[in-house]
């Protein structure tokens, strides 16, 4: 079994604790968070794990270190783990400072330890199936992608404990959600370049973005359009459409997968009873492969860096035209 340490025990860390305990290949041996209540909450899912006295002790206990802390300390913990010979599985983003993240990626590569980033759709059925359909020609010529994300409030209710998500310094929907769909788009269409972007912020300048719009393109000129907004009475909407000349594919809410040949989108399967469990198990299955040196589908740290560069460009309103 893979002895695993979890650092950062908010909602994402707690979910990972729950699902790693369920998985036969992992043993959660140590937990750490600066908030004692978060440690207690995670320990309810992994009662056999030790709540470490500090991050250093937690890192020393495991062979794999999972990091779900806010972005700012992520580099420090990742390098401490990797230089100690531990495999590292990170939540995204790698950070918020691009040069610091470039340095992190270079130094992680130099250690030679297994590393991956938890873009949650990487090992999922939708990305796997759409990739196969595109390669088989079932979609015709790929024609780009549309990303639409809207929320009545940000952060979402289930993220209330992660207060940093509401601030521009580390949070916001672009880093937290749109990044997943940019990763997905690059996996299918190839590397993207930011053409133009606009991000709007509330009058209280330390809060995160409320609206974003952007256009990105592949080297061949295929467009990826992004629209995100917060506000108004509406349900959450998280949607990626990969467009083809014969058929298009749409992924909604991270797990609903549908196909259109020009008519209404038709679901490929009923909604699963527990989509999060299916997604996390797929990620963990591939993490086992990666640690064993086998081929895997998880996001690499290089892919995560590319996404971070795009995200920070969108948030800054950068692009070819600026």
Where are these regions (language model features)?
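N-terminal Rossmann-like dinucleotide-binding module
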Residues: 1-45
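Beta-loop-alpha module in the N-terminal Rossmann-like domain of NAD(P)-dependent dehydrogenases
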Residues: 16, 46-105
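Active-site loop of classical SDR/Rossmann-like NAD(P)-dependent oxidoreductases
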Residues: 34, 271-285, 299
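C-terminal helix-rich "cap/oligomerization" subdomain common to oxidoreductases
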Residues: 57, 64-66, 219, 286-322
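Hydrophobic residues in well-ordered beta-strands that form the structural core
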Residues: 67, 90, 115-117, 226, ...
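Rossmann-fold dehydrogenase core element
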Residues: 103-121, 141-145
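Predominantly a Rossmann-like dinucleotide-binding segment in NAD(P)-dependent oxidoreductases
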Residues: 121-198, 202-204
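Contiguous beta-strand/loop segments that form the cofactor/metal-binding neighborhood of enzyme cores
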Residues: 182-256, 284-293
């Amino acid at each position: 079994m893979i002895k695993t340490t979890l650092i950062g025990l908010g909602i994402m860390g707690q979910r990972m604790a729950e699902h790693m305990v369920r998985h036969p290949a992992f043993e959660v041996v140590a937990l750490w968070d600066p908030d004692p209540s978060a440690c207690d909450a995670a320990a309810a899912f992994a009662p056999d794990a030790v709540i470490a006295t500090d991050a250093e002790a937690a890192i020393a206990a495991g062979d794999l270190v999972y990091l779900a802390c806010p972005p700012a300390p992520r580099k420090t913990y990742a390098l401490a783990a990797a230089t100690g010979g531990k495999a590292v599985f990170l939540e995204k983003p790698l950070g918020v400072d691009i040069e610091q993240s470039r340095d992190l990626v270079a130094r992680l590569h130099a250690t030679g330890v297994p590393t991956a980033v938890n873009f949650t759709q990487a090992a999922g059925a939708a990305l796997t199936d759409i990739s196969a359909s595109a390669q088989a020609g079932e979609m015709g010529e790929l024609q780009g992608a549309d990303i639409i994300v809207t929320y009545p409030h940000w952060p979402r209710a289930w993220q209330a404990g992660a207060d940093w998500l509401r601030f521009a310094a580390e949070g916001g929907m672009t880093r937290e959600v749109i990044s997943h769909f940019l990763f997905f788009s690059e996996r299918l269409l190839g590397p993207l370049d930011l053409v133009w972007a606009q991000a709007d912020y509330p009058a209280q300048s330390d809060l995160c973005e409320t609206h974003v719009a952007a256009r990105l393109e592949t080297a061949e000129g295929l467009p990826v359009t992004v629209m995100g907004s917060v506000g108004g009475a509406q349900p959450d909407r998280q949607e990626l459409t990969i467009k083809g000349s014969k058929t298009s594919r749409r992924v909604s809410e991270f797990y609903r997968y549908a196909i259109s040949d020009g008519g209404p989108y038709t679901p490929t399967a009923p909604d699963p009873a527990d989509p999060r469990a299916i997604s996390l198990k797929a990620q963990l299955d591939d993490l086992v492969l990666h640690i064993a040196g086998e081929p895997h589908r998880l996001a690499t740290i290089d892919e995560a860096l590319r996404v971070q560069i795009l995200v920070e460009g969108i948030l800054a309103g950068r692009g070819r035209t600026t």
